């Protein structure tokens, strides 16, 4: 489709201009749902990757917390070798937390993109007035988009804030100010636990949506097969009727 317009210049015109052509693909409801199912599958795979990365962040924080806990009794040892080992551990922990902050921000951006893409899918289904799609729209709204929006606007920000505070405490430790990082570690891990639980709940809804899509497709296939059988029966009856008149 292309929009073309002309002005009312009677002296040197009319002048005609046109917009950029836009191509539209007309598909059946079944074809649209099949395309949507492919989109959902690809988005879900990306979401599973995000969830795995958030879990890895939690795992790394717990690992380094454990290492700091093990080294706690060495803090009073004045030996140069021990001081060097502790300094190396402290620096490695700061680096780990910095990497975790960057990773969580990347995960947040990806999850925001996933929320937007599911919103686009929902709008596409609604705007095309696909029949029998209301249960799917409700599942997308209530099970995926709404909780993802909460995760994006609240959970990720809370994780980010807690990790930034943890980094600050660890930097104070590196500067020999003897800050205790364990409470901050626990706050970050607790927030990650809560967010992972919510991400897993969204993933479960995505998997349910896939099951619903498969069930709807099976129903459509059955209806289509019945219609084809009815048409075949009608044609056979018509053929026999014509043969009987000859």
What kind of region is each of these model predictions?
Residues 1-246:
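Extracytoplasmic/secretory ectodomains and luminal regions
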């Amino acid at each position: 489709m292309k929009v073309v317009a002309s002005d009312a210049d009677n002296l040197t015109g009319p002048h005609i201009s046109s917009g950029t052509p836009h191509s539209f693909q007309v598909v059946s409801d079944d074809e649209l749902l099949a395309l949507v199912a492919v989109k959902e599958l690809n988005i879900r795979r990306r979401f599973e990757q995000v969830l795995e990365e958030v879990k890895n962040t939690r795992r790394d924080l717990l690992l380094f917390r454990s290492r700091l806990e093990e080294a706690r009794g060495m803090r009073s040892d004045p030996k140069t070798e021990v001081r060097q080992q502790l300094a190396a551990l402290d620096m490695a922990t700061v680096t780990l937390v910095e990497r975790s902050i960057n990773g969580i921000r990347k995960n947040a951006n990806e999850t925001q993109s996933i929320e937007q893409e599911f919103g686009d899918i929902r709008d596409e289904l609604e705007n095309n007035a696909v029949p029998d799609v209301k249960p799917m729209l409700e599942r997308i709204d209530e099970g995926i988009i709404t909780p993802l929006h909460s995760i994006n606007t609240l959970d990720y920000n809370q994780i980010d804030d807690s990790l930034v505070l943890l980094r600050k405490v660890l930097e104070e430790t590196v500067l020999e100010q003897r800050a205790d990082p364990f409470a901050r570690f626990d706050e970050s891990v607790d927030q990650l636990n809560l967010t992972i639980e919510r991400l897993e709940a969204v993933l479960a809804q995505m998997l349910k949506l896939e099951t619903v899509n498969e069930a709807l497709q099976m129903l459509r296939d059955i209806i289509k097969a019945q219609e084809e059988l009815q048409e075949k029966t009608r044609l056979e009856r018509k053929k026999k009727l014509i043969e009987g008149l000859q």
